[in-house]
């Protein structure tokens, strides 16, 4: 849980939390997948792939939900973006609140953002808007919702969810990133700089 929270909010060193979970239970497939995702986002691709392959091996006899979760992570690392995205969409139809499956789909560097497809910003927004009724007051999801709205020009629609994110989790780096985007797109650059100057000094990396 700790590693997932750190990873989804871009806080420092989530891989260390996943390592502790693996030390406590070496056969915990989702911890290996989480570690793989964290390592991949830190550009440690070979280590990430090894961790994901271990997760796949350990997930073989687990329920479909866990297997699918691990597979999305591994396909993303292996470069199978189209397959990863298709699997993620199918997974989210059944398990709409699985954050570790949704996360790779979101953001400008996600499976949708990097697809190169026309209308990808609207596609990302449609996905999160469809999932919104399942999520409630969750800072990870509110960040994704706000970002998708900013990217489609709905600045005011993004304001409430990102403000709520930072109320719930003031040190969320993803939340701070989206808030900075919102200020920029709204033309409030002075306010955006003030926000960042206040937020950044305590961020570890």
Predicted regions and their residues:
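Canonical tetratricopeptide repeat
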Residues: 32, 66-68, 102, 142, ...
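Residue-level recognition of tetratricopeptide repeat
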Residues: 27-30, 62, 98-101, 138, ...
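Alpha-helical junction/boundary sensor with strong preference for TPR arrays
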Residues: 7-10, 25, 59-62, 94-95, ...
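Structural motif corresponding to the intra-repeat A-B loop/turn of tetratricopeptide repeats
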Residues: 9, 42, 78-79, 112, ...
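Residue at a conserved register position within TPR or TPR-like alpha-solenoid repeats
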Residues: 6, 39, 75, 109-112, ...
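Alpha-helical segment of the N-proximal tetratricopeptide repeat
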Residues: 1-20, 24, 70-80, 114
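Alpha-helical repeat scaffolds
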Residues: 17-20, 48-59, 82-95, 118-133, ...
